[in-house]
Amino acid sequence: MQDISNHTPMIQQYLKIKSQYQDILLFYRMGDFYELFFDDAKKAAELLDITLTARGKSNGESIPMAGVPYHAAEAYIAKIVKKGLSIAICEQTGDPNTSKGPVERQVTRIITPATVSEEAFLDNNQDSILVSIFEKNNKYYLAYTSYTQGKIYLVKTLTSLNELKNTVLKLSPQEIITNSRELAQQNPFKKPIKALEEWYYSNFEAKKYINDSLDTNIANNILNLYKNDQLTTIGSILSYLTNILKDTPRHITDISYEQEQDTLNIDINSRINLELDNNSKSSLLSIIGKCKTSLGSRLLKRYFSNPTRNLNILATRHSIINSLGENQHFLKIQDVLSYISDIERIISRVALGTVKPKDLVALRYSLEQLPILKKLLSEKNTPEITNINNRIHQLDELVTLLDKAIIENPPTTIRDGGVIKEGFDKELDELKSIKDNSYDFLIKFEELQKQKIGISTLKVGYNRVHGYYIELSKQHADKIPTEYVRRQTLKASERYITEELKNFEDKVLSSKEKALAREKLIYDTLLKKVIEYYKQIQETAASIAEIDVLANFAERAIKLKLSQPKFNNLAKLELKEVRHLAIEHNIDEPFIPNDTLLSKDTNTLQIITGPNMGGKSTYMRQVAQLIFLAYIGSFVPASYADICDIDTIYTRIGASDDISSGRSTFMVEMTETAYILNNASAKSLVIMDEIGRGTSTFDGLALAKACAEKFAQMGAFTLFATHYFELTELAKQYPNVCNIHFEAKEYKDNIYFMHKAVTGAAKKSYGIQVAKLAGISQDVLESAKQNLYNLEKKQQLTESTQVQAQFQLEPTTQNPLQQKLDAIDINTITPLEALNILFELKKR
């Protein structure tokens, strides 16, 4: 640590504390402000757009300083946290009246992007995720927690950086911790990440934190169930949270393992290509996600992150959707749900000590809705709905307690009192009555003093510095009684105190302090009582979230004309009248649906041709989106859907340069294609759009043909859009390949897209007509037409050899020299025979 002896005692104290929190901003409490110094001040001034000032000197230079008011700090902290930065809150813990030197201060809380619980810091519709990555022997062990949900999830061991990246980005965490400094430095996730000290990833420490943090039975089960490296990863989260909270994270009550074989996997590029859950208005989530509660919105996002292939779970969801859809029963349920607040996060704030009085009012009001909700659910007496209803706890005792204890519109904090209802605590009421009745005393006291000394202008008042006083004009100085003691001199008047008024002041101020202390004690006791219901409220919140999502699915099914999908084990994907929801939502004219059939018995690969804007990409995307919706338990945009087991969806759609990594468009395309080829299986759905565009015609055609053949050979369900008409010949070579195309009609030099998939190969690309629609000038179009005519004429002259060269990509006959060389057996030939052959070849 640097020499700080030349600084003032206060700055010395600051630097000592700051040395323990070098990588985060230190909010240092000074009176009614949080102050920041040195580099922290510069950074805060820039981030928060606040004034940068100075205080004192350091090495002859002014010390930068910036500050925010204590009462408004929450808004400033929220801005910092949302930028991915962390903050240490340093409070005054000593008594200024008894302190020698600077008032004692210590960090009471650390706020990081993933460990906040206050409403102002959180996105209500998104989980706050903390990910821990333990790297060991080229393997990645990953665990994560949704902080306010009170659970830790363990993910399967990952064996590649690409697999790790996909897993992390799918979770979209607010914060990542790791033992790998190299990984933190590279940060392939582009998320807030920090490398922690080694002890956080010590197996010994991990087991200690598991035992200290979790219920004994849960801890024993975890220690027996998981391997050491998995325990290390779980323990790293618990130790990190303990350090952040300055307390044991007792709100963590569950550890679970995510079974990959139960989920439909979609890599991050495919998620982006399919516009599943980004923030745009055209995303699938924006169309499907109309939940009434924050609880439901977050659960739906979890469904989007981990679509399930468990058919029992899907059957349960579909059964509930059907039940809630009968007579639009979901409308009554959604009406009740709209009055329910985020009780999951409220009870977490209670456990973490960050709850506000208004949260308790919101909790009470939400719990009051539960009897109504339970009654509505009981009207649909199915086993699936009854199971959810049984996990919604009707907490009447807690409702009564909160109703009696907290006023209807409490202040923001308990700090200044005024939270506890009159009649809840007799002692508090008595203390408050002293202050409340003080006005009557002062009126009577003032009137008595006026009569006593005969001065009608006498008045009794109060200020925070000098307390209660009797004020008289200086012209009445000769009438001042001897019992009046001067308290303050003003320009035109004097202020006095009497023994009676001083006794009253002591009583009132004492009662106010005692009332605040009593109210704080009652409030803390109330929170301890509320936390006894923690597990019941968490279970209730989870059940409300589930019924909210399924009621939302029921409403969407009717509103968007969705149908219930079927599942088969026949390796067949049969879809009728499929629609693309986002496009249908955003166009005025009717959307034209299409059928899709993929089957091991007929075709697993469709070569799709047709003009740009004809509907090829929409057709492929809508199939992938339909499969995705089926596996989150929603109904689907088709009149009929019979779906087989799909374990992964891969897409290769569009591309652009990756300038930051020095990769061209073609390199990006080939990298993504290689990933799909190396990982796809017979249970995959593969979407390939225009492979080979970024290179020469022959190279592109060769690569596209090879890729298509590979998918045909592996039997993956593949939709393969291309402008290489030569690929349509594959249907003659492979029985599981078929051609479909999207038609267009020409009329008077104009093109009209039918958007309908038709069996067979397209005969034209209509590129010039599409260029006309795009606004290309007429002279360029005429030149293009002439060029096209010349090229087609040339093509006709050499069609047989040209097509053969493009399509076969190898010589039709072998060179005689090559034949002779291939016939030589180098394992049996003698040196003399080799020389004779060489002599013979040279003569040729």
Curated annotation (Swiss-Prot):
ATP binds at residues 610-617. It comes from the Bacteria. InterPro entries: DNA_mismatch_repair_MutS, DNA_mismatch_repair_MutS-lik_N, DNA_mismatch_repair_MutS/MSH, DNA_mismatch_repair_MutS_C, DNA_mismatch_repair_MutS_clamp, DNA_mismatch_repair_MutS_core, DNA_mismatch_repair_MutS_N, DNA_mismatch_repair_MutS_sf. One of its GO terms (molecular function) is damaged DNA binding. Coiled coil: none annotated. PROSITE patterns: DNA_MISMATCH_REPAIR_2 (PS00486). GO terms for cellular component: cytosol. Keywords: ATP-binding, DNA damage, DNA repair, DNA-binding, Nucleotide-binding. PANTHER family: DNA MISMATCH REPAIR PROTEIN MSH1, MITOCHONDRIAL, DNA MISMATCH REPAIR PROTEIN MUTS FAMILY MEMBER. This protein is involved in the repair of mismatches in DNA. It is possible that it carries out the mismatch recognition step. This protein has a weak ATPase activity. HAMAP family: MutS. Belongs to the DNA mismatch repair MutS family. This is DNA mismatch repair protein MutS.
